[in-house]
Amino acid sequence: MAKRVRVGQIVNTQGVRGQVRLWPLTEKPSRFNEIKRVFVEAPPQGAPEVLTITSAHPLKKLVIVSFQEISDMTQAERLKGCYLTIPVEEVPAPEPDSYYHFQLEGLSVFTEAGERLGQIEEILETGSNDVYVVRQASPPGEVLIPALKSVVLKVDLAAGTMTVRLPDGLR
């Protein structure tokens, strides 16, 4: 099965014509106007696995989405809580020196001296910059690494590695 990336989560219905309120998992919610087909991750019994987007428009922090296959509130209700995904090949290329979270999660993190710190387990979105949660095997625990150009020296997606310069006192 091809790898898929989550692009949003259906949080509620909208109106009686089958529209849904979608929490976007993308920095640019306007992309839902470009996406034509989404997959429902673990769809409920009898719900469609593939949906065709017919319209999408922003509403505060959400996106109101209509699907060709969903025509009433009862059908839309069954999709509450479901994640929508697209094939990784359909994800637009990021800006230069930028990465999507799914590309960074799981990378092995090394110091500039070559010491293995661990693996990126999670990415926290804070106000000013992201923070990488790096799970350590020895000693057991985690290191929180700020996603700053002064800290992250190199990302090699092909090798599955990230090289960092730890700020003083981070350990």
Swiss-Prot record:
Its main location: cytoplasm. PANTHER family: RIBOSOME MATURATION FACTOR RIMM. The keyword Metal-binding does not apply. Binds ribosomal protein uS19. It comes from Heliobacterium modesticaldum (strain ATCC 51547 / Ice1). An accessory protein needed during the final step in the assembly of 30S ribosomal subunit, possibly for assembly of the head region. Essential for efficient processing of 16S rRNA. May be needed both before and after RbfA during the maturation of 16S rRNA. It has affinity for free ribosomal 30S subunits but not for 70S ribosomes. One of its GO terms (cellular component) is ribosome. The PRC barrel domain binds ribosomal protein uS19. Keywords: Chaperone, Cytoplasm, Ribosome biogenesis, rRNA processing. This is Ribosome maturation factor RimM. One of its GO terms (biological process) is rRNA processing. Belongs to the RimM family. Residues 96-170 form the PRC barrel domain. Pfam families: PRC_RimM, RimM. It comes from the Bacteria. It is found in: Cytoplasm. GO terms for molecular function: ribosome binding. InterPro entries: PRC_barrel-like_sf, PRC_RimM, RimM, RimM_N, RimM_N_sf, Transl_B-barrel_sf. Transmembrane segments: none annotated.
